[in-house]
Structures are given as structure tokens and as C-alpha cells.
Amino acid sequence: MEANTIKNDFQTKEQPSKLEIQTWIVDYIAELLEVEANKIDVTIPFDRYGLDSSAAVGLAGDLEEWLDEELDPTMLYDYPTIESLTEHLIESLSD
């Protein structure tokens, strides 16, 4: 999946908001699973959505490209929900 397939609305800003990051991840997972975005619960662990290690690495890589920030490809194991990953990203981007 290409990172640019999901619209980057913060191109003129320095950093995306928590909502923008969370929405990007939700949209990404929804597109990957071919479901509506409103079916994705941000508190459900990624593995419950059936994301295997290659899908997790793909998500991390596309998110890295979208944010234009270097990210650890294993971060989805440390932050196993959309909610926890979003919180982590907001904290790390503001450093």
C-alpha cells in the first residue's frame, strides 16, 4: 500500500495533530482490511485485526513516509493499539 494513497492534509503544518495521525492510521487499517473506517476501534490491538508482522512493518514504513520521520518498525509491538501508537507518536514528534 502506498502512503500517498491516504491524503496528507497537514502538508503546510509542521506536525500533524493527534486526530490527523489517528485518522491516517484508522484509514490505513480500514483500506488494508477493506472495511469502513468506522468499523475500526482504536482501542483494539492490531493483532486482533489480523495484522501480521509484515503488515505491521508495512504500516510502520508507510507511516514513516507520511510523517517524514524515522520510525522503529517494531513500534507496533510496543504500542499495540491505534490509540497507544498515536499517543506515542504525538509525544515523540513534539520532542
Please identify what each model-predicted range represents.
Residues 1-95:
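Flexible, low-complexity inter-domain linkers and amphipathic docking helices that mediate domain-domain
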